Amino acid sequence: MSNNETITNYTIKPHGGELINRVVEGNERERLIEEALKFKPITLNPWGISDLELIGIGGFSPLTGFMNKEDYTKVIEETHLSNGLVWSIPITLPVTESEADKLEIGDDIALYGEDGQLYGTLKLEEKYTYDKEKEARLVYGTTEEAHPGVKKVYEKGNIYLGGPIKLLNRPKHDAFSNYHLDPSETRQLFHDLGWKTVVGFQTRNPVHRAHEYIQKSALEIVDGLLLNPLVGETKSDDIPADVRMESYEVILKNYYPEDRARLVIYPAAMRYAGPREAILHATVRKNYGCTHFIVGRDHAGVGDYYGTYEAQELITQFEDELGIQILKFEHAFYCEACGNMATAKTCPHDASQHLHLSGTKVREKLRNGESLPTKFSRPEVAEVLIKGLREK
């Protein structure tokens, strides 16, 4: 198992300087799968499996495993790893106290999914307790259980396991196999396309007209767009990933230049950590090879927990250290007087002329069976969403 080499003439290095690769293949994989039958087993939930995959493929470079206590504490308290690199979200493996009692430091542990599939192994270096309320307050900015990310923290086991992992089997993303590229592959893709500058766009919503406006504004100053939708675990009222993916396909086909945009899945779980998660999203896109990253209004937010531009304000503090250029956009809207999409920076008209678009509004209208106006959504996208949700 070796680290992937960064393409030498590519313009941006991964976070920490090298792209981590913990994927085990060939004879070593066969041997480890056989040996893992004798290892002590732990079952990971879908969130844990997503994290395991992203560590394994280098999306979470420079992490090589689940965090030890020193890194965990530094991350939640200081937004950095113990080696000094910016990192904003704890990537941890929780277990119950009874599970932890059966494990000894130095053990090789087999990591299974809830489907019974073996996904990887962990070399146990550390077991440690943590303060759930403190983690919630520092990472999510609230201790309210109504926050979906905080709820997950409170539901977790009381012990974290730390240590390096090996990824033996990949989670299945069959419905999206054409769009499932690892960071080493996106870097090669950008190189092959001749893109020297690439802007990443994170989304868990269908692309509405405000998103399209922001993406195309960014495309005016870079070579290519990586539309990188999250397809891991989200809230139950979010639009399902398969429906969203079809909507992305149709908008790219009909409204974007073929040689300047690519669709690739981001196989992560959504934490809804707002400003902190914006930093993680930028870091991961840097690992995928993006030189620029878009942060819009209430990035990775939920409800009213974060201010409209709080994520932009926090990420600006770390932009130089992150090493990826952050493109900050104001809330875009359709202006009836201008007759097009705009922001407060480009439109002089009063708010009564503005039609504000958001993923929340799109979801509400679709759930209520309402059609989406063309000022809100491209008709082809609306058709896909209405049909997809009707079939669910």
Curated annotation (Swiss-Prot):
SUPFAM superfamilies: Nucleotidylyl transferase, PUA domain-like. InterPro entries: ATP-Sase_PUA-like_dom (IPR025980), PUA-like_sf (IPR015947), Rossmann-like_a/b/a_fold (IPR014729), SO4_adenylyltransferase_pro (IPR020792), Sulfurylase_cat_dom (IPR024951), Sulphate_adenylyltransferase (IPR002650). Coiled coil: none annotated. It comes from the Bacteria. The keyword ATP-binding applies. Disulfide bonds: none annotated. It holds the Pfam family ATP-sulfurylase. GO terms for molecular function: ATP binding; sulfate adenylyltransferase (ATP) activity. Pathway: Sulfur metabolism; hydrogen sulfide biosynthesis; sulfite from sulfate: step 1/3. Its EC number is 2.7.7.4. Keywords: ATP-binding, Nucleotide-binding, Nucleotidyltransferase, Transferase. One of its GO terms (biological process) is sulfate assimilation. The keyword Transport does not apply. It catalyses: sulfate + ATP + H(+) = adenosine 5'-phosphosulfate + diphosphate. Belongs to the sulfate adenylyltransferase family. This is Sulfate adenylyltransferase. It comes from Staphylococcus epidermidis (strain ATCC 12228 / FDA PCI 1200). The lineage of its organism: Bacteria, Bacillati, Bacillota, Bacilli, Bacillales.
